[in-house]
Amino acid sequence: MIRAIVTDIEGTTTDIRFVHNVLFPYARERLERFIRSGEQREPVNLLLNELRGEIHAPAASVDQLIETLFKFMDEDRKSPALKSIQGYIWREGYVNGDFTGHLYPDVVPALRRWSDQDIDIYIYSSGSVPAQKLLFSHSDEGDVTELLSGFFDTHVGAKRQVSSYRNISMKTGVPVHQMLFLSDIREELDAAREAGWKTVQLIRGEPDTQSTHRQVSSFDDIHPEQIPT
C-alpha cells in the first residue's frame, strides 16, 4: 500500500498562472530594494554569499549579483539562492494580505482524505521550503499545513534527478515502492519512477501525448489505496 504521497506545487496543486502572474512579478518588483536594504546583515548577506558560490564568483559585487538574479529570473533558473530570496519577499506579500496561495478546489479535500487514511503527505518543489510553507499556511483555504508531514526543495536534489527521489525516501523512512509522486511534468515523473516510486501525472490542460504515466485532471481521481505496490 502507498504510505506516503509527495506532490509538486506549480501546475499540480496550484495554477501555474498564480506563480508566473502573481508571485514572480511581486518578487521581481521588490528584489533590488530587498537586497540593497539588507546586504550588510542576515539573511541577505548569507544569501548573497550563497549566490557567489553558485556562480563561482567569490568577489562579485552587489550590483553584479542583482544583475545575475534578474538574469536567473528571466531564465526561470532553479537557483537555491534566488528561490530563498524570493521566499523572503513573498513572505511580506502573504503576511500583508497582498495575495493568498492558490490551491485548486480539488486539492484540500483530497489531502484530508489521504490524511484520514494515515498516508503521510509531503511537498517537493523547486521553490524554497519557507516559500512552500507560506503558500500552504496562507492559502485560499486558510492554513492547511496541519495536513502536511514535511517539505522538500532542491537541497535534496533537482527534480529531474533520480537520486533526489531516493534521498526523499531515505529522509521519510518510507520504502521507494510505497511512495507516490504527483506532478504535471513528465521528466520529473520519469526520474521518480526510475527511483522505484509510483507516479501519477496531473493534467490541468491538454493531455501529454508523450507521457507513459497515468494521467488525471483532478486530485479526485487519485485513489492511493487502489495503486498496487
Swiss-Prot record:
<keyword id="KW-0479">Metal-binding</keyword>
<comment type="function">
    <text>Bifunctional enzyme that catalyzes the enolization of 2,3-diketo-5-methylthiopentyl-1-phosphate (DK-MTP-1-P) into the intermediate 2-hydroxy-3-keto-5-methylthiopentenyl-1-phosphate (HK-MTPenyl-1-P), which is then dephosphorylated to form the acireductone 1,2-dihydroxy-3-keto-5-methylthiopentene (DHK-MTPene).</text>
</comment>
<dbReference type="InterPro" id="IPR023214">
    <property type="entry name" value="HAD_sf"/>
</dbReference>
<comment type="similarity">
    <text>Belongs to the HAD-like hydrolase superfamily. MasA/MtnC family.</text>
</comment>
<dbReference type="GO" id="GO:0043874">
    <property type="term" value="F:acireductone synthase activity"/>
</dbReference>
<comment type="pathway">
    <text>Amino-acid biosynthesis; L-methionine biosynthesis via salvage pathway; L-methionine from S-methyl-5-thio-alpha-D-ribose 1-phosphate: step 3/6.</text>
</comment>
<dbReference type="GO" id="GO:0000287">
    <property type="term" value="F:magnesium ion binding"/>
</dbReference>
<comment type="subunit">
    <text>Monomer.</text>
</comment>
<protein>
    <recommendedName>
        <fullName>Enolase-phosphatase E1</fullName>
        <ecNumber>3.1.3.77</ecNumber>
    </recommendedName>
</protein>
<dbReference type="InterPro" id="IPR023943">
    <property type="entry name" value="Enolase-ppase_E1"/>
</dbReference>
<feature type="region of interest" description="Disordered">
    <location>
        <begin position="208"/>
        <end position="229"/>
    </location>
</feature>
<keyword id="KW-0486">Methionine biosynthesis</keyword>
<keyword id="KW-0460">Magnesium</keyword>
<comment type="pathway">
    <text>Amino-acid biosynthesis; L-methionine biosynthesis via salvage pathway; L-methionine from S-methyl-5-thio-alpha-D-ribose 1-phosphate: step 4/6.</text>
</comment>
<dbReference type="Pfam" id="PF00702">
    <property type="entry name" value="Hydrolase"/>
</dbReference>
<dbReference type="InterPro" id="IPR036412">
    <property type="entry name" value="HAD-like_sf"/>
</dbReference>
<dbReference type="GO" id="GO:0043715">
    <property type="term" value="F:2,3-diketo-5-methylthiopentyl-1-phosphate enolase activity"/>
</dbReference>
<feature type="compositionally biased region" description="Basic and acidic residues">
    <location>
        <begin position="220"/>
        <end position="229"/>
    </location>
</feature>
<keyword id="KW-0378">Hydrolase</keyword>
<dbReference type="GO" id="GO:0019509">
    <property type="term" value="P:L-methionine salvage from methylthioadenosine"/>
</dbReference>
<dbReference type="GO" id="GO:0043716">
    <property type="term" value="F:2-hydroxy-3-keto-5-methylthiopentenyl-1-phosphate phosphatase activity"/>
</dbReference>
<keyword id="KW-0028">Amino-acid biosynthesis</keyword>
<feature type="compositionally biased region" description="Polar residues">
    <location>
        <begin position="208"/>
        <end position="218"/>
    </location>
</feature>
